[in-house]
Amino acid sequence: MKKVFLLPAILLLGISGIAQKWTKEYMHVNEIACGLSLVEKDGKHGYVNKEGKLIIPLIYDEGMNFVEGRAGVMVANKWGFIDSTGIEFVRPQYSEVYSFNEGMAAVAKGESWGFIDEKGNLIIPMNYTNARCFSGGLAPVCNSKGLWGYIDRQGKTVLAFQYGYADRFRDGTAKVMKSGKWIYIDPLGKVVKEGDE
């Protein structure tokens, strides 16, 4: 019986030893996401597979983990997006970006935020001063008065701009600040629980 358990243990140690060997080549190694891991070497970023093979060259100044098969990458202080083969489908042009979620990504030029689709088309105009990722079909956005509300995937305001801050929905609730207090709301804006901060 001991032989049966010994073989998997030897294989596991061998695999982890190989992984540790290639990770030492890099200053930083992120967790694997969508089959690829963001790595950094000599101030440049690229992506390796789980075996440590460089799939996307170390040519970026910064990078993000892959989400929904896409990753934000920065060149010369501008962000764009690549797919998991390294093909750039959004040229670096944005000052800030968030990862894709539900097929859309929040992007900024200067202080103006909007949303692009999976092809890089601007779907929701840059009418906001801040934004977060879509979740549950809604995204928190901030207007020019500094108030947060929620929009749907067509850019229609669903929950009015009334919050001092609004986070994305997680498990059907979102944390927002209203009248200086943290509360949790549902997608209809109903308070479901008082905040903890």
Protein language model annotation of sequence segments:
Residues 1-21:
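Bacterial Sec-dependent N-terminal signal peptides
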Residues 20-197:
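Residue-level detector of conserved, function-critical positions
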